[in-house]
Amino acid sequence: MECALLCLCALRAAGPGPPWGPAGLGRLAKALQLCCFCCASVAVALASDSGSSGGSGLNDDYVFVVPVEVDSGGSYISHDILHHRKRRSAHGASNSLHYRVSAFGQDLHLELKPSAILSSHFRVQVLGKDGASETREPEVPQCLYQGFIRNDSSSSVAVSTCAGLSGLIRTRDNEFLISPLPQLLAQEHNYSSPAGHHPHVLYKRTAEKRVRWYQDYPGSQRTYPGHSPSHTPPASQSQEPEYSHRRWQKRHFCGRRKKYAPKPPAEDAYLRFDEYGGTGRPRRSAGKSQNGLNVETLVVADAKMVEKHGKDDVTTYILTVMNMVSSLFKDGTIGSDINIVVVSLILLEEEPEGLLINHHADQSLNSFCQWQSALVGKNGKRHDHAILLTGFDICSWKNEPCDTLGFAPISGMCSKYRSCTINEDTGLGLAFTIAHESGHNFGMVHDGEGNPCRKAEGNIMSPTLTGNNGVFSWSSCSRQYLKKFLSTPQAGCLVDEPKQTGQYKYPDKLPGQIYDADMQCKWQFGAKAKLCSLGVMKDICKSLWCHRVGHRCETKFMPAAEGTACGLSMWCRQGQCVKLGELGPRPIHGQWSAWSKWSECSRTCGGGVKFQERHCSNPKPQYGGKYCPGSSRIYKLCNINPCPENSLDFRAQQCAEYNNKPFRGWLYRWKPYTKVEEEDRCKLYCKAENFEFFFAMSGKVKDGTPCSPHRNDVCIDGICELVGCDHELGSKAVSDACGVCKGDNSTCKFYKGLYLSQHKANEYYPVVTIPAGARSIEIQELQLSSSYLAVRSLSQKYYLTGGWSIDWPGDFTFAGTTFEYQRSFNRPERLYAPGPTNETLVFEILTQGKNPGIAWKYALPKVMNVTQPATKRYHHTWRTVQSDCSVTCGGGYISIKAICLRDQHTQVNSSFCSVRTKPATEPKICNAFSCPAYWLPGEWSACSKSCAGGQQSRKIRCVQKKPFQKEEAVLHSLCPVSTPTQVQVCNSHACPPEWSPSPWSQCSKTCGRGVRRREVLCKSPAAETLPESLCSSSPRPEAQEGCVLGRCPKNNRLQWIASAWSECSATCGLGVRKRELKCVEKTLQGKLITFPERRCRNIKKPSLELEEACNQRTCPVYSMAVASWYSSPWQQCTVTCGGGVQTRSVHCMQQGRPSSSCLLHQKPPVLRACNTNFCPAPEKKDDPSCVDFFSWCHLVPQHGVCNHKFYGKQCCRSCTRKS
């Protein structure tokens, strides 16, 4: 199982002792693991007046609007915006609704349709006292809608029209919430509207709490179904988030261990073998489904949750949250089409019998998973997934409030007992918790833990709940985990075609429009919390800062909800505070790049794997576009030739790679361990030789590793893929009893018999002698007995159970094949080998009592059966068969094939017919006449524009193919009248925003090297300035560069000076010595300082010789002309400190000439270390621009968020010191 923990520790800047930081996470176990979803909460002491309620800045986060219903053309219909399906029918057959909202200087045309989130059989069931059950038609679902904003196809809308408009509106880069205007808020602003109008408040997530405060204010008259949270989470006690798994009942912790370790709970009674295979549903592959995958979801709200929001309003609230969850799973970055379908909602007024819910998340989830496993619909069908929403402040390891947000089993989806999660109600952020926990149920683990994805990239599966500038998406690792899970049989429950959904809809507004920033703070920090009023309004789109009694502003580093107001006519969209209602580019759906070349084969023999891959980058999905459908890789087998006989098994090679790597401080010799569960066949399990333990050394074996010794199937990317006897991936071809691929046993002769003789105990007795070349050998006892099967050769060499020594069951390789020896306490003994054998074998029985009877059988190819007299002589003759012509015109060939027939009608192997009488099979010419002329189009030219609609053209030719010739151009009149298209429109999608640099400024210096700057803005095609995040897909042009207007006056102290001569290049005879010119400056003290040569480029170099000959002593002359090594002087060291290298040349010389007669072991060294003294530490110069802008910056490195865009820049000095 996996728990999602949100660390709520309020860290006071002036508090004593070091604050607790977000803890690290342990490893993930194989089946049931617990995952920690952690985020540090920073509390900063700010000067605040206790009476502050948010300040005037809140006006920038919300506006008052009056929505009106319009028709599809935008024409006014009515101010009455309360809609149910019955009402809609009056306007026509269309199910769509249209509203217009004017806000922030723009008209938003909302186009809505009934939401497909709910099943047509969706019902709300209320479980009351004494188990009383009430099932009713829900009032809310008839007014739930989803849709988009007209002229902004990257937008999404999810609203309820039950009592005005309430919900979420998402544009390209902003998120808004909308809800009916609370009366108290209207009174504060002295606002009133004409009779018949229904005023609403449109606000960002930053204003959610403020609007919500007015909605929940005692005595406040609400004009929409509100949610009045009475739950105040207790202050965090700096508790460590916990990470644990249950596979072997061991405990691990997220972060540092507490002073005491909680006792692990007892074994879960319900954690039994999963029953996802017994649902009766078709087990098609979910990963290869061409349609969307549907997660039929049961949602259960406990009594505290129902009490918190009210029985009448909780349904609307839950469906609003689930609608947000649905949109997160429809995000293009997930890479699959996942539909969340709510089939039932159960509201608990009291806990039913058998269900225990309290603060203890682990125990509560155990109880809930077991309880929901017994729930079955009236039609006998079960839900695929169950979600428990609780009003308890849950804790993963004790029955007290702490920092846990959710809990879920990893890879539990579709399991009867493990497809379930528990999630703590925290407001609209609950949607992210549900998506995160359900992601674990889909087999996803945290980013950055055992995978290459980074922890703090703002993805849904990040261990810390921190968005990428307020935007959450799915990482590439999450896509891979999901893809792997969907390829398993377990995911088959998701392939069900969804039944037509009913009339139930989701709220059609952004969450931040329905619930303002104050309400979001109240959900996160308690009923008395509200938005912090001290200058953090513009940053709430990245992190929502809240203020509660105690004069502290604090955050959980979670962004305000999409659509939360962040300023005057501004709202939060995708983590940016942007202009309200700003329209963005259309979604760009991802398209695949071209396939790459085939990779290298993973093996040199024995059947490896190679692949081609492509990337979803042509273009990549943007602005809400869909991820590319299909697979990013295709595989095929390669190098299928057998490996040499004595070569090491491929799996054994991989285990042997760990022989020289210490394992827990010791070296072992490893060999493969294959007695594992079927789903673990593609993991690398190795056993230490001479020790009784094995370990999973790798999560997956190398591609091309056989899944098991006796099958053709191979492992690819950790998944066992089917391979037929024809060595084709995905092939179901099998060999017959005689090893003929796709054979029908027609070439086999079968032998079988029964051995029933009784003998004296404790002796060996022959059962059957099977000759070499036998295949499909099977020897089996008829009943359980105390006797044992044995095998030996004709020369009395025992291969199995010889010398009265009983072998354990397993695989035994001898006689050219592998025998599978099965012996169980409740089944008779059995021996099986596919063959063929390369020697004659004698199968015996070592009697230990009565012989129950032994059945044996084997097969021999008929051509080998020379000892058996033929019962019938067959007549074999050749016959020719011919194919159709290879072409219909232009000259082709008919291929002719000779086949061997038995008695003129049965085709058999060609070896039965005589080669001497085989007829000729030369191909025949056919259809040797010219083809009709046709148009041959050329390649399309490049598009004239990359976006906004361009043109491309191509040339066409009229060609004709004559017999056995290439096509040649002919008159256009010979071709058909209609011609292929020669010009077409291309790249019709809207142009994305792009960087727009302004002209360069003047150079900062009048001479020498200076700097010039320019402003670089992100602009739309209409030259409107947009947030920089919208242009992040392309490199940002440089805003600063170096410049030189002219050379500065000369430095009179610079001059060229020649260095000293080097040593002579030869120790005897004629050599060469060199020197070089250096650019130096002479100081007042007379010292010379060397500069790069470019500093003296304006000074004329002196005319000096830099190389001259040098004569050393005469080389000795040897009478016997012995070859010797001669070395040059050592060159200058490569560095002055810290350890460098000196080199020299060494030559073998004989009588002054190069020679190869020197002894190699006497050759002097050509390289040596030099200047190994330590270098002095460089002086650090502080960057004057690297400063802290806030007094609480010292907390940022303590909580590990220096890589956060906002906190890293604003607290540069603290982060630099920490590093």
Curated annotation (Swiss-Prot):
GO biological process, one term: extracellular matrix organization
SS bond partners: C369-C420, C395-C402, C414-C493, C453-C477, C521-C546, C532-C553, C541-C572, C566-C577, C601-C638, C605-C643, C616-C628
Active site: E437
Residues covered by region (Disordered): 217-248
Domain PLAC: 1182-1219
Annotated localization: Secreted, Extracellular space, Extracellular matrix
Positions that bind Zn(2+): H436, H440, H446
Cofactor note: Binds 1 zinc ion per subunit.
Glycosylation sites: N151, N190, N745, N838, N865, N909
GO cellular component terms listed in the entry, alphabetical order: extracellular region
Chief place of localization: secreted
Proregion span(s): 48-284
SMART domains: TSP1
Amino acid composition bias (Polar residues), ranges on this chain: 218-241
Protein name: A disintegrin and metalloproteinase with thrombospondin motifs 18
Organism: Mus musculus
Encoding gene per record: Adamts18
